[in-house]
Design a protein with these regions (language model features):
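Primarily short, surface-exposed interaction patches in extracytoplasmic proteins
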Residues: 1-169
Length: 169
């Protein structure tokens, strides 16, 4: 996957890096070892269908390293394909559909707010597992980016305690 890829790439990468969830199998069929379905994949990918890569220019590009001149830009609701393409409403993995976003707000902000919410331990568990794995050579869940029903944490109580402490600070 490369920067500037398709929305599906952003969906797969975001789930893996920030949530420790592998959903790429669900792009075509139900995940063989986990609960994720094609509908879950399509709904999660909808968070990323409203953006494209754009190049920073002028004042915006000053002081930015060359390889970071491309950024993701929110396009806003599109009228171009209204009524022509069936769209899937954004849905948080394992969570509810995201209600209509008021005022043209980027739905990725809604996703980010959910990811870092104290009500959602998934992000915190994934991050503390990565930090643990980086410093100690092995994660509490291995591989680091594959929390699933078939691979339980080696020490669930420790993982939960670290995640709660991470969220508190």
């Amino acid at each position: 996957m490369k920067r500037g890829g398709q929305p599906e790439h952003y969906s797969i990468r975001t789930a893996s890096v920030f949530l420790g969830i592998q959903i790429q199998c669900a792009q075509c069929h139900k995940h063989p070892f986990d609960r994720w379905t094609k509908a879950d994949f399509d709904s999660f990918t909808s968070f990323f269908r409203v953006s494209r890569m754009a190049t920073l220019k002028g004042e915006d590009a000053r002081g930015v390293r060359n390889d970071y001149h491309k950024v993701s830009v929110y396009l806003g609701p599109s009228e171009r394909f209204a009524g022509k393409v069936k769209s899937t409403p954004p849905k948080i993995l394992g969570g509810p559909l995201v209600p209509y976003v008021e005022g043209g707000q980027d739905p990725r902000i809604v996703l980010w707010e959910w990811m870092r919410s104290p009500d959602n331990p998934t992000f915190a568990r994934s991050i503390v597992n990565r930090i643990w794995g980086h410093h100690l050579g092995v994660g509490i869940v291995e591989p680091l980016d594959d929390f699933n029903q078939a691979v339980p944490p080696s020490n669930p109580a420790l993982l939960n305690w670290l995640a709660k402490d991470f969220m508190a600070h």
